[in-house]
């Protein structure tokens, strides 16, 4: 019998919040430090989002960072989309989930981890021991012995598994180890003779214990770690399913209120609706939690990286809403419920509520504008007797209507139709480069000598706030990513010193430039980055020899720092002006501060007007002229936030922060360099405002010395234009407008002439029309004529040929520019009455050339992208029409 004091067979029904609290409190009582959930935007550049509870501790497991505590416990919010097609369709797949975990960093190991896991499961959550099955790695005899002899689990309820299931590693090299998993058995009455843990109708894994005790080297050998670690994870949603006695995670109190709210909006009942509707409602409930947290943590919808994931989830919510009958906008309404459900565990949701709801409102309204048109086009495509949506059609849905490829695939699959993925990717490659999504695995492999060695240095002392020069000692030199003792003239190097005045690239501000010198040495520093608090100076040795442990003079270029500093302070003023002039909910989505200019990205539903831009510019220049003192303070982050300081979404801050305060105007958490008075900026000028993604705008501006450069460049351009147009500077606009009108008129004349030539050429082709039964059919290749010219020619030929006539043209309008194809089909009214449809016919022809299109029954146009297939497509069109007209 298991050694457990649990006498209750039926576990209590705890809410999701109660389960979370019980887990955390249990480990706090066992001397674990409670840690708040990390952001969904991880520090780790190898992953887009936080995908596991252990991800925030990766540097500790790698030995790159010391832990502040030997034991920790947390409830970590996570996002995974690699199994998105299973969300809503299985009992336990989610995009957003919470992972409860307890961690040991070289402190306790297997015995304690196993005992506490059992105690928590049977005494805190009061699970019946007969409902628990244990899996162990088949070679981990130590863990199996602890389960049997210390905990007292019956041998027939301990299952030995292979490395594929019970040996944890996430790369070819690095820390790894066996794991042991706890499964809940919903049907213990079936006995333990033939336990199949793959049977998810009977078993659910709810707790995973990873014993990180080895390091795998490049040859695959396992060496014991000097310090062994414990990494565990309990899925909150899974434990809620068990304790609340539900058949799936979705019907727990963590998610079901969202599902029920969506059902009410759809005017259906979840309990009695069909399986398809239930799946859609589950997807809506799951995705709502995900998008709410993503926006809260600073992600904005876009076509790149994290933004693309957010946009994809939002658009799937909208589409599944329509599938169950929700036509009106509903995302903000549902997000309010999500915030209410999760506010106790994540109070920042309330703080960011306005931003979350506004982002969802903007993105939903934008997508609804195009969704209906896109759905109609997709319905038209799939209504034909076809088994494949071409890559060009899928790309048109993506590029024109905002349909993610996955959404097109999902709709097509529901109709039993495939999508040409390769064709879509070819179209994408021609027109747009999109950032590749990072791997969803956690990489704990060897990171290369420079990353490993740099992490071993002491922190660099930064003195650049107070001065631009300092004497320092060289403590590290890297050449070709290898540590060296010295570097000579011409060598590209990375240099680490014990102290530096050089600002390292961070917070949107670029790194300083300057020189490192000694008696005969000169190194040009072109950029400075930092890893944690170790500054890495990249540059080239101009003269002399750079040696380890040598004393050097560090010199930042003053003019470079002055320009960068001016643009950084101006960035703070710009954000304040945006909030005052546009909306207080405007927030920073990204920035770049260089010596030439500043770039500021922010959320906004529409372009700013000229007047809004002028008002902001005037407001900022007024603040500059008022000569405000800029105060820089260091204080606890809680005190700074209470005082109203702004923090950038997605940025990581410590317990103590640096605050840049322009009293009454701006207060931000910032580690960048700034002027001491606003008057030092001189002038501020906005040079551009544009959209970079749906709901995201970008302002480019300049301040300080950069403004003079800008006006000098503009003056030179004006002088050159005046000289070229032979007019005074004030007459340039009028002259350009006049030339534009002339060009427009000439273009119209050219099109007219080309169409007349096409018509004349086409009428000359009338003799090539062949008789097919009672009909006349003309199919020809006609290059050098655009779509409108071909349509005009085809219409005239129909009139010329008379009743029962059909004309098909295909060609390359302009081979000098590209090889894009254009097709035109024209049918006489009597052929249309007989059932022929020009739009459908020409669409089928274009598909053979990687294109698509359509139009009216009597006249239609399509395009293509594969000129090598043009002649064959026209030949097939001839065969098809000849057969139909015979």
Swiss-Prot record:
GO terms for molecular function: alanine-tRNA ligase activity; aminoacyl-tRNA deacylase activity; ATP binding; tRNA binding; zinc ion binding. HAMAP family: Ala_tRNA_synth_B. The gene is alaS. Belongs to the class-II aminoacyl-tRNA synthetase family. Binds 1 zinc ion per subunit. Its cofactor is Zn(2+). Zn(2+) binds at residues 568, 572, 670, 674. Consists of three domains; the N-terminal catalytic domain, the editing domain and the C-terminal C-Ala domain. The editing domain removes incorrectly charged amino acids, while the C-Ala domain, along with tRNA(Ala), serves as a bridge to cooperatively bring together the editing and aminoacylation centers thus stimulating deacylation of misacylated tRNAs. The keyword Protein biosynthesis applies. Pfam families: DHHA1, tRNA-synt_2c, tRNA_SAD. This is Alanine--tRNA ligase. PROSITE patterns: AA_TRNA_LIGASE_II_ALA (PS50860). SUPFAM superfamilies: Class II aaRS and biotin synthetases, Putative anticodon-binding domain of alanyl-tRNA synthetase (AlaRS), ThrRS/AlaRS common domain, Translation proteins.
């Amino acid at each position: 019998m298991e050694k457990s004091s649990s006498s209750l067979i039926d576990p209590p029904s705890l809410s999701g919040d109660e389960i979370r609290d019980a887990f955390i409190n249990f480990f706090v009582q066992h001397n674990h430090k409670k840690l708040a959930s990390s952001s969904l935007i991880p520090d780790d550049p190898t992953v887009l989002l936080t995908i596991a509870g252990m991800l925030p501790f990766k540097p500790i497991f790698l030995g790159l960072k010391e832990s502040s505590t030997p034991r920790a416990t947390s409830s970590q919010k996570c996002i995974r989309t690699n199994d998105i097609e299973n969300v809503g369709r299985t009992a336990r797949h989610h995009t957003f989930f919470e992972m409860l975990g307890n961690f040991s960093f070289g402190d306790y190991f297997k015995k304690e981890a196993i005992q506490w896991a059992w105690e928590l499961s049977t005494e805190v959550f009061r699970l019946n021991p007969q409902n628990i099955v244990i899996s162990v790695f088949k070679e981990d005899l130590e863990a199996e012995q602890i389960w049997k002899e210390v905990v007292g689990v019956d041998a027939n309820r301990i299952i030995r598994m292979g490395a594929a299931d019970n040996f944890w590693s996430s790369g070819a090299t690095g820390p790894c180890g066996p794991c042991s998993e706890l499964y809940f058995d919903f049907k213990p009455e079936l006995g333990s003779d033939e336990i199949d843990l793959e049977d998810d109708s009977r078993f659910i894994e709810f707790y995973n214990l990873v014993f990180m005790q080895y390091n795998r080297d490049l040859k695959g050998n396992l060496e014991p770690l000097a310090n062994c670690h414990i990494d565990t994870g309990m899925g909150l949603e899974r434990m809620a399913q068990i304790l609340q006695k539900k058949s799936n995670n979705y019907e727990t109190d963590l998610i079901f209120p969202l599902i029920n709210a969506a059902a009410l909006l759809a005017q259906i009942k979840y309990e009695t609706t069909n399986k398809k509707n239930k799946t859609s409602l589950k997807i809506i409930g799951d995705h709502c939690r995900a998008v709410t947290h993503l926006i809260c943590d600073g992600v904005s919808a876009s076509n790149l990286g994290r933004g693309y994931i957010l946009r994809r989830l939002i658009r799937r919510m909208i589409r599944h809403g329509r599938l169950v009958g929700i036509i009106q906008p509903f995302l903000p309404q549902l997000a309010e419920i999500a915030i209410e459900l999760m506010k106790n565990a994540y109070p920042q949701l309330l703080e960011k509520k306005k931003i979350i709801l506004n982002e969802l409102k903007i993105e939903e309204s934008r997508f609804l504008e195009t969704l209906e048109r896109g759905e109609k086009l997709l319905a038209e495509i799939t209504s034909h007797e076809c088994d494949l949506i071409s890559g060009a059609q899928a790309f048109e849905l993506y590029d024109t209507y905002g349909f993610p490829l996955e959404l097109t695939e999902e709709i097509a699959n529901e109709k039993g139709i495939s999508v040409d993925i390769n064709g879509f990717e070819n179209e994408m490659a021609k027109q747009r480069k999109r950032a590749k999504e990072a791997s969803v695995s956690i990489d704990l492999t060897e990171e290369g000598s420079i990353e490993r060695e740099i992490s071993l240095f002491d922190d660099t002392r930064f003195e650049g706030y107070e001065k631009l020069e300092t004497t320092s000692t060289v403590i590290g030199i890297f050449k070709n990513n290898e540590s060296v003792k010295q570097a000579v003239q011409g060598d590209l190097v990375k240099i680490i010193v014990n102290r530096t005045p050089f600002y390292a690239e961070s917070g949107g501000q670029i790194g300083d430039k300057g020189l490192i010198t000694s008696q005969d040495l000169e190194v040009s520093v072109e950029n400075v980055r930092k890893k944690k608090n170790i500054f890495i100076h990249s540059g080239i040795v101009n003269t002399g020899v750079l040696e380890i442990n040598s004393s050097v003079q560090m010199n930042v270029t003053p003019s470079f720092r002055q320009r960068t500093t001016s643009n950084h302070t101006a960035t703070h003023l710009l954000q304040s002006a945006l909030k005052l002039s546009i909306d207080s909910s405007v927030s920073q989505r990204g920035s770049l501060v260089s010596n030439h200019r500043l770039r500021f990205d922010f959320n906004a539903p529409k372009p700013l007007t000229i007047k809004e831009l002028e008002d902001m510019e005037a407001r900022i220049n007024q603040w500059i002229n008022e000569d405000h003192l800029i105060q820089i303070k260091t204080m606890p982050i809680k005190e700074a936030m209470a005082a109203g300081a702004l923090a950038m979404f997605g940025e990581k801050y410590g317990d103590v922060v640096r605050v840049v305060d322009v009293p009454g105007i701006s207060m931000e958490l910032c580690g960048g360099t700034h002027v001491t008075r606003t008057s030092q900026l001189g002038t501020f000028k906005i040079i551009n405002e544009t959209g970079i993604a749906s709901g995201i705008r970008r302002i480019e501006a300049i301040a300080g010395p950069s403004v003079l450069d800008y006006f000098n460049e503009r003056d030179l351009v004006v002088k050159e234009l005046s000289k070229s147009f032979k007019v005074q500077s004030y007459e340039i606009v009028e002259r350009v407008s006049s030339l534009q009108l002339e060009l427009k008129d000439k273009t119209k004349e050219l099109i007219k002439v080309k169409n007349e030539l096409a018509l004349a050429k086409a009428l000359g082709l009338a003799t090539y029309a062949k008789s097919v039964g009672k009909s006349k059919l003309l199919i020809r290749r006609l290059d050098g004529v655009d779509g409108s010219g071909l349509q005009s020619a085809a219409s005239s030929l129909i009139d010329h040929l008379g009743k029962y006539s059909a004309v098909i043209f295909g060609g390359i309008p302009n081979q000098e520019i590209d090889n894009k194809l254009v097709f035109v089909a024209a049918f006489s009214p009597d052929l249309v009455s007989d059932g022929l449809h020009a739009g459908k016919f020409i669409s089928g022809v274009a598909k053979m050339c990687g294109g698509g299109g359509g139009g009216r029954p009597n006249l239609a146009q399509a395009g293509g992208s594969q000129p090598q297939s043009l002649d064959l497509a026209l030949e097939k069109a001839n065969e098809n029409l000849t057969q139909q007209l015979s």
